[in-house]
Amino acid sequence: MTLWINGDWITGQGASRVKRNPVSGEVLWQGNDADAAQVEQACRAARAAFPRWARLSLAERQVVVERFAGLLESNKAELTAIIARETGKPRWEAATEVTAMINKIAISIKAYHVRTGEQRSEMPDGAASLRHRPHGVLAVFGPYNFPGHLPNGHIVPALLAGNTIIFKPSELTPWSGEAVMRLWQQAGLPPGVLNLVQGGRETGQALSALEDLDGLLFTGSANTGYQLHRQLSGQPEKILALEMGGNNPLIIDEVADIDAAVHLTIQSAFVTAGQRCTCARRLLLKSGAQGDAFLASLVAVSQRLTPGNWDDEPQPFIGGLISEQAAQQVVTAWQQLEAMGGRTLLAPRLLQAGTSLLTPGIIEMTGVGGVPDEEVFGPFLRVWRYDTFDEAIRMANNTRFGLFCGLVSPEREKFDQLLLEARAGIVNWNKPLTGAASTAPFGGIGASGNHRPSAWYAADYCAWPMASLESDSLTLPATLNPGLDFSDEVVR
């Protein structure tokens, strides 16, 4: 029984699904998808649970959320192993994901008070008040790269605000989704407040098509995000928060310490086997001898990166991709770019058939026209040379995406120029692209999405503002508008 609906674990009535470790092939999870009727059942349960959950005080809802945080802490080792085995990422990185889940809860609670709590301003004849109210029933779509942390960034703020939820994890990480849901169950969530439906495309389409849905919170690919946007078009009554991908540029301008710059670039491009929406996809490198030396060092160090199993000792920097198919898609993208005229500096290699262990790839595309503006979701970096910083900024902005942009340079003036001209939601200076502050907005513009699905700014789209003018008594104004006469003679 792998669906959790209205407080009960039930068996899915849809297609059967088996999840294997992407490196070893070990069977980790088996179950059945939720069919359309079960998705509707989950929605009815969430709708029935909404009034009571929304009417609880914030303090009462907060108790449940904080209990969940405690369960994450006490089950950290077990959840770390589940995430690592299911995604293929090394144990050390899965542990950082669980830590991030725990830390985001305190941030979410503070954010609710600061951004969407209650405010009151006294007026001569009363007061002006601002309150926030939950939307109702929300669908949360989770991604596979951070199957615990990223859905958590939607679920926790939504629950604090008083919403009820239908959660669909990625079909590639059903085990992680179920494991997190069992912790919510232990935390004492009332039946129907949070419901789990497993499944792929058909389940997702049934969920997003629900008429009795007040909103949808999505993290995933741009293609799926666009489909959801089209599906919900013409329904302004539904909140739609999309966090999608990026074709992120990293500008290497002047390099004082080549090793430090190479380290930053590898952290930006290849951590999580390149499976972060924040990863650098385009390396913009200043022409010249210094750029040549940097690139040679980057290739040499990247060549020594060997992906390994989640529990290898010593731990590898990167593990496998989410599936062999995902790894093969990266290889195919490299082959296509090479056929277009790209110069391969480091060829990505699948270490063993039947696994997802893929070595990093680097290809130079300077002077090649018609390069697709697409996110290749894996350890693969494309390189372009530039001559002037103005040219670098134009190249950085030459994308339909707008999530992340980074600059390596000792010159503050160039960073200030980039801040003024960059089309990106996050712009870093001498910091990896894969680093972001939890207390800052996270998200982008253009094809990278809307809203800001971090714990801090997620509060904004998990509740709607209600403004009020209030007075505890009704009195006739001392001064009336022209044309109004309440004299005794007129009244009689």
From Swiss-Prot:
Catalytic activity entry: N-succinyl-L-glutamate 5-semialdehyde + NAD(+) + H2O = N-succinyl-L-glutamate + NADH + 2 H(+)
Superkingdom assignment: Bacteria
GO biological process, one term: arginine catabolic process to succinate
Residues the record lists as binding NAD(+): G220, S221, A222, N223, T224, G225
CDD domains for the chain: ALDH_SGSD_AstD (cd07095)
EC assignment: 1.2.1.71
A GO MF label: succinylglutamate-semialdehyde dehydrogenase activity
Active site: E243, C277
Pfam families: Aldedh
Keywords, in A-Z order: Arginine metabolism, NAD, Oxidoreductase
InterPro entries cross-referenced by the UniProt entry: Ald_DH/histidinol_DH, Ald_DH_C, Ald_DH_CS_CYS, Ald_DH_CS_GLU, Ald_DH_N, Aldehyde_DH_dom, SuccinylGlu_semiald_DH_AstD
Xref: Gene3D superfamilies: Aldehyde Dehydrogenase, Chain A, domain 1, Aldehyde Dehydrogenase, Chain A, domain 2
UniProt pathway annotation: Amino-acid degradation; L-arginine degradation via AST pathway; L-glutamate and succinate from L-arginine: step 4/5
This protein's record includes keyword Signal: no
HAMAP family referenced in this protein's UniProt entry, alphabetically: Aldedh_AstD
Family the entry assigns: Belongs to the aldehyde dehydrogenase family. AstD subfamily.
Described purpose of this protein according to its UniProt entry: Catalyzes the NAD-dependent reduction of succinylglutamate semialdehyde into succinylglutamate.
Protein name stated in the entry: N-succinylglutamate 5-semialdehyde dehydrogenase
Species of provenance: Shigella flexneri
High-level lineage: Bacteria, Pseudomonadati, Pseudomonadota, Gammaproteobacteria, Enterobacterales
